[in-house]
Structures are given as structure tokens and as C-alpha cells.
Amino acid sequence: MEDFVRQCFNPMIVELAEKTMKEYGEDLKIETNKFAAICTHLEVCFMYSDFHFINEQGESIIVELGDPNALLKHRFEIIEGRDRTMAWTVVNSICNTTGAEKPKFLPDLYDYKENRFIEIGVTRREVHIYYLEKANKIKSEKTHIHIFSFTGEEMATKADYTLDEESRARIKTRLFTIRQEMASRGLWDSFVSPREEKRQLKKGLKSQEQCASLPTKVSRRTSPALKILEPMWMDSNRTATLRASCLKCPKK
């Protein structure tokens, strides 16, 4: 699974996922399914905000990469992918600027057009079940919830899907592609089944114990994408870099 993730996701997304797991004390070498899930969620959040801007009239417009209208305001603020301290700093800044109610839990995005925080969900299960779990956890009508599945289904608060149909179709197509690529490599069943995931986790722990005494080689390589991203992370105009087109899965 780890090899699949590194082949099928943008290096920037992979490194952000690595940092997230490290922050929470999780080992991506063992919890490979979680590694894949985090990368998938990050990519969906980035795709959700791709190309969406607000013009001078306050209207939401779609601008493709390379368009000269660089001074347009980005419609979405990406919160997901930041370390917790920085993420809460961004949330507090948004609340102070817009008057939005501070959420109890860290959301994934902020929509400047609709003036609301957004929680993005990507599920391997039924969308309505995952939606209810999210709603019960958040317990706030102020945070908008939007759930996507790997089967092309989606569910959103009050059936308000925020994005246009084409933008949502891009996300659904990407998720379906990830599912197909996992299935072709025999990875989908373990990814979708908690029982199989636990079995793989135990197997990984046992394997790690056996290999603990072996010499290891640590890679110090940093992807060019992340080198560009890091100094721009606090810049409100960093989106062109952040929204770098995601790598497609190579054929088996």
C-alpha cells in the first residue's frame, strides 16, 4: 500500500500526510491504510478548492490555471494539511475577520462566498452513515458537511453541494480511479474492511519486531514541490503552488 500511495499521489500530498501522521505519533510503515486515507482526503480538499475564485462583484467564478486574473480572491481557505497550531491560528484569524462562529473541531476549508466552514469526508462505507457520524461529532449547524464516497455517491448538509457539477465530477472520478487502481493491485479489500486492516496491522507489528535489529537507511530527500510550498505556506496567495496538478496513477 505504501508503494501505491507514493506512486499515485503528488509528492507534496504524500509529505503532508507523513507530517500529519508523525504529529499524531502514527507509523505510516504500519498503518498504511490510514496513510492512504489521509492522502486521499488531502487530495479531495485540494481538488475541492481548485480553480474557484471570487470576483469583484462577490460572485464565485472558475478560473483555470494559467489565466492572467491573478488578483482574484480565492474562494476557499485550505485548513486541512497544516499542523494543528497553525490550523487553529488560521481558524481564529478567519473568525476574527468574518465574524464566523469558532468551530469546536478543526474543519477542512473555509468558504468565503458562503461564509462557512466546511468539513470534507471521504468514506469507504455508505455516505449517509458517515454523514450522520460527522454530524453527531461536530454538533454544529454552522459547519457545512460534504461527504464523498469511492462509488460516486455524495451527501451534503441540506443537499447544498457548494460546487458546480463539473467540479464535483472531477472529485468523484479521481476517487473511482483510486479505487480501481487499488483493486487491480489487490489492495482494495484490506482498505475497505476494518477487520482485514486490523489483521494487516498485527502482521505489520510482528514484522517490525523481527526487523528491529536490522540496519536501516533513511532517505533525506525532500520533494521539489514541498520546497516550493514551505516558504509560501503562510502566504494567502500560495494557492497556485498548493493546487499543483495531482499525479495520476501509473498503469500497473
Curated annotation (Swiss-Prot):
Cited InterPro entries: PA/PA-X, PA/PA-X_sf
GO molecular function: RNA binding
Family to which this protein belongs: Belongs to the influenza viruses PA-X family.
A Pfam entry, by short name: Flu_PA
Superkingdom, natural source: Viruses
Keywords: Decay of host mRNAs by virus, Eukaryotic host gene expression shutoff by virus, Host cytoplasm, Host gene expression shutoff by virus, Host mRNA suppression by virus, Host nucleus, Host-virus interaction
Protein name as annotated: Protein PA-X
Any single biological process term in GO: viral RNA genome replication
